[in-house]
From Swiss-Prot:
It comes from the Bacteria. The lineage of its organism: Bacteria, Pseudomonadati, Pseudomonadota, Gammaproteobacteria, Enterobacterales. Residues 18-83 form the HTH luxR-type domain. Disulfide bonds: none annotated. Gene3D superfamilies: EAL domain (3.20.20.450), Winged helix-like DNA-binding domain superfamily/Winged helix DNA-binding domain (1.10.10.10). SUPFAM superfamilies: C-terminal effector domain of the bipartite response regulators (SSF46894), EAL domain-like (SSF141868). Keywords: DNA-binding, Plasmid, Transcription, Transcription regulation. The gene is yuaB. This is Uncharacterized HTH-type transcriptional regulator YuaB. It holds the Pfam family GerE. Residues 42-61 bind DNA. It comes from Escherichia coli (strain K12). The keyword Translocase does not apply. Residues 98-350 form the EAL domain.
Amino acid sequence: MNTIKIKLNLIDYDSIVNIEFPCLLSEIEIELLSQLLKGYSVNEISKRRNRSIKTVSCQKMKLYKKLNVKSDLTLWRDVFLRFKAYLQPKNIICDNFNSSVLPVVSSKGESMAHYNIYYQPIYNAKNGNIAGCDVTIALKNSDGSAFALDSDRINYNPNDNKVSYLFGHINKLFSPIKNNLPHGFFITININPEDILTCDIERECLHFIKVFGTERIRLVLQFSTKEELYIIRRYQSSLRRIRNNNVYLSLNDFGMGYAELSHLQNIPFSYVNLHKTMFHDIESNSLTDIIATTIIDLSKQLHIDVIADGIETKKQAGYMIERGVKYLKGIALSSPLPADAFVRKLLASLKQV
């Protein structure tokens, strides 16, 4: 039988992976599969190929069905189980997944050792205590320090193992202190809309609920608005199922990107993050005051809690408190912290209650 070979260069591991497929794939499917195996997201592939995200998503779903691949999380495993693959230069033949050891690879061949996880405290506006945290991943510099935590750095690519790694890190960090946390403490994990398609989010959420329960800790999935949210609208049933399992949803950077008022109407969000550009000049611009107040009042009527994200001055914090905003986050209160520093800050805050 004629075969098609796909060759992948894993630079971090000084290896080349060769995979042989039966001649059942078109040139477009071969190119798409190669990019998916390299860790490119649907969004990145759409830009490289000048195709819409929707088109690439549909092509990927058809490809996975043809190859009997369950999801992105199982892509490498399913490929190694069903097709012949081998590594160079070691020439390890592996007709099934269990007979080989493949390094864990995330986006574009980067290992998780290249990343740090940071926790930014979210404060209760009424009493000033830490009410939750925003969890993000930042890529390290060559010297081991972290890149600046701007939104372009911390929004990881969804088509990789970082989601599972992130959940594992959170479980390990909070398990020893879960009984010390105040009731309603919420942990916010940033994801992209296409993660609903490309990552086994629901499984990770259910495992989290199994470990921590629902009485003390709230798990919040926060959706980026940098890309279109049509995927969220398309998979509302999945979101509602997740929500019915006591996982909460948040809309990030409201007022920016693709965030629309209709999303508040059609998707069961419990939180919205009010982007700092919506209030950064609140002290000098009356129009900003009107817009921010309108968004806050609308959210209240929809029973959605507002998190003022990007507080830089005490006056901004005071303004938000006066308007009845429940939660505050920003460098005026605390910068994102490594895990150990965050836990120390959190436990110190709890002792003051």
